[in-house]
Amino acid sequence: MNFANFPRPSDPAPLWQGAGEPSTAGISAAPSAELAPKPRLPRPTTAPTQEAPAGLRFDFNDGCRVMLPDAGRAWRVRLSDRQTGNVLFDVDLRSGHVNSAKRYFVPFRLEVWSDDERVLRHDYDARGRDVLIQFPVGTIGDVIGWFSYAVKFKDVHQCRLTCAMGEPLIALFRSAYPDITFVTHEMVEADRFYATYSVALFFDDAEFVYQPCDFRQVGLHRTAAYILGVDPAEQPPFVALADDSRPIAEPYVCISVQATTQCKHWNNPEGWDRTVAFCDEFCSLIQHLPGANGEADRQPAAVNIAE
């Protein structure tokens, strides 16, 4: 659990260290725009988005966050997990903010007292509220594998769901899911959301801040289910393309030669030459199968390597 003073408007903006870079720091000075790396995922707002009595503010956009104004009296804040009944955090402070240690889905209960009077009790409830689920850009298969779990989250919580992802992928899903709003990272309006969840691969999350379990143990696609707290059973997403016709009229073979990590590369020095030779030979054999008439629609095209 992290707690610190919220910055005044004149203070430097806090440095949010992005998914995959868990931090226990409270507030840090932001580097210059020239030096600051582009965040892997959109940042949450500095202050929580939801208003509450007595000048309190809270939200679930980076775990559970609550801001406590300096009202000349002590506050007591308690965070609980309603599913397990465990008290996660219970502290007294005069002002500042409290941020849960876990940033994945937890059914939080937030309680705040002032001078022994409880001024806020809020149970997480996304029904009818705006929720953002954000995915990294630059990957296709991962997001396709994760997206159906975002749909499950929407169905379970009956929220107004916005999904942030790479623009090329939006075209796959938008028509198939008209009840979900799709945006690019640049289009995210962070101050709209009651809750935000980041679905990605967190390689260095040793403290399990952004994921409840290591994706290498539960499976790359199922990690989304555990981050979002939904049933991990597989459910392929629907896709709807404006033009789903064949890009090439003849039968063809696709071979990809790129990968996101070295361990996925095929480093066999003769591998591609042998693969292409085999495919060319296979295409030639098909033309001589019984029933083949030599027409264009029966003849496989030459094998192309997709760069």
Segment roles from a protein language model:
Residues N2-E307:
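Catalytic machinery of carbohydrate-active enzymes
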